[in-house]
Structure formats: C-alpha cells, structure tokens
UniProtKB/Swiss-Prot annotation:
Miscellaneous remark of the record: Negative results: does not show effect on rat Nav1.8/SCN10A.
Disulfide bond annotation, renumbered to this chain: 2-16, 9-20, 15-26
Name under which the protein is recorded: Nemertide alpha-7
Similarity field: Belongs to the nemertide family.
Lineage of source species: Eukaryota, Metazoa, Spiralia, Lophotrochozoa, Nemertea
Locations listed in the record: Secreted
Organism: Lineus ruber
Function according to Swiss-Prot or TrEMBL: Potent toxin, demonstrating strong inhibitory effects on insect sodium channels (Nav) and reduced activity on mammalian sodium channels. Potently inhibits inactivation of insect sodium channels of B.germanica (BgNav1) (EC(50)=9.5 nM). The toxin also delays the inactivation of most mammalian Nav (human Nav1.1/SCN1A; EC(50)=171.5 nM, rat Nav1.2/SCN2A; EC(50)=50.4 nM, rat Nav1.3/SCN3A; EC(50)=170.2 nM, rat Nav1.4/SCN4A; EC(50)=810.6 nM, human Nav1.5/SCN5A; EC(50)=155.6 nM, mouse Nav1.6/SCN8A; EC(50)=147.6 nM, human Nav1.9/SCN9A; EC(50)=129 nM).
Length: 31
C-alpha cells in the first residue's frame, strides 16, 4: 500500500502515489 510521509508525500509499494507533490507515479500492477 501507500505510506504517507508528508503533506503531499508517499512511499510507493505497488500503488499509485504522489511523489512529494513533484511527480505522480503509478507503479505496476496498478498502472
């Protein structure tokens, strides 16, 4: 799942996450 680490930050683990408000990442298999 996703682990929130800040206002717009998440640590990705096979899920769609916002990378500290800079870039939106969608990691497989949830692309």
């Amino acid at each position: 799942g996703c682990i929130p680490v800040g206002s717009m930050c998440t640590i990705s683990n096979g899920c769609c996450t916002k990378n500290c408000g800079w870039n939106f990442h969608c990691n497989k298999p949830n692309q």
